[in-house]
Amino acid sequence: MREYKIAAIPADGIGPEVIAAGLQVLEALEQRSGDFKIHTETFDWGSDYYKKHGVMMPADGLDKLKKFDAIFFGAVGAPDVPDHITLWGLRLPICQGFDQYANVRPTKILPGITPPLRNCGPGDLDWVIVRENSEGEYSGHGGRAHRGLPEEVGTEVAIFTRVGVTRIMRYAFKLAQARPRKLLTVVTKSNAQRHGMVMWDEIAAEVATEFPDVTWDKMLVDAMTVRMTLKPETLDTIVATNLHADILSDLAGALAGSLGVAPTANIDPERRFPSMFEPIHGSAFDITGKGIANPIATFWTAAQMLEHLGERDAAARLMGAVERVTEAGILTPDVGGTANTSQVTEAVCNAIAGSNII
């Protein structure tokens, strides 16, 4: 029996709702497979923890997480806590502290979901966005001076290192090489940002020589939004900076139907630390407690987690079950359905129990 230790951090808003659904589906997979076991420990960190203790997680939070095989994360952010506190107090310290430098965000149109793009079928939008997750625009460097005065100044410094850019570029090329189309698009803004972004372009060209079977091109980030919208079929694997990929992946989720179906994995490819898996969507306080949060993104990111742990059959079984449920029209309101979170979760669990695909 293969056993894994998972740290669950539901955190804020709909996070507890979708993580509970995700754990229910993982339990169904355990029962269906019969050859692996997941042991989960839940941590109450997040905005409510901050209101009680003045911090989003305890000082020894990373030490507590080190012993786990993976981290299953919900969502962070609350209306009554500044966003920079919630982000820099919980999610980013985990990503950066565990050197989860590869943020991997697959996007495709699931069966039964109608995308907003006219004449865009399931095969026309099937991407993976690779986001540099350790430096760049989210390095945390900068400051404020002369606060409250007319001369007040704020600086936000983006830091790009040769080591950081090279390793994410190599990761993206390897991923593109493993996909059927062997196609990679490198996104920058090197016409206007003439230092770090030009270095990105140069390093991309250097790394490309290691992967002669991968066809690659480069795009400016503003032009990329147009290409994603008008010519989605021309794209496959995409790599971009921390900020650019953050924005583009939200657009990708919307183009596929909803952020409610968009997953992400924060990966330490060297496996020195646990990697973290989370849905892209935010805490969504406007629907918190209504029972209508879309759990599909959480199920998909659970599949990413299983694949990372080496449970590829279980990951495939989960995604097969998800696609059968969406194709049957059992959908939450954000993708045009009438089902609630529990109904979608139950349907996926039933599909797993009856699955004979593997």
Curated annotation (Swiss-Prot):
It comes from the Bacteria. Its cofactor is Mg(2+); Mn(2+); K(+). Binds 1 Mg(2+) or Mn(2+) ion per subunit. SMART domains: Iso_dh. InterPro entries: ICDH/IPMDH, IsoCit/isopropylmalate_DH_CS, IsoPropMal-DH-like_dom, TTC_DH. GO terms for cellular component: cytoplasm. Belongs to the isocitrate and isopropylmalate dehydrogenases family. This is Probable tartrate dehydrogenase/decarboxylase TtuC'. It comes from Agrobacterium vitis (Rhizobium vitis).
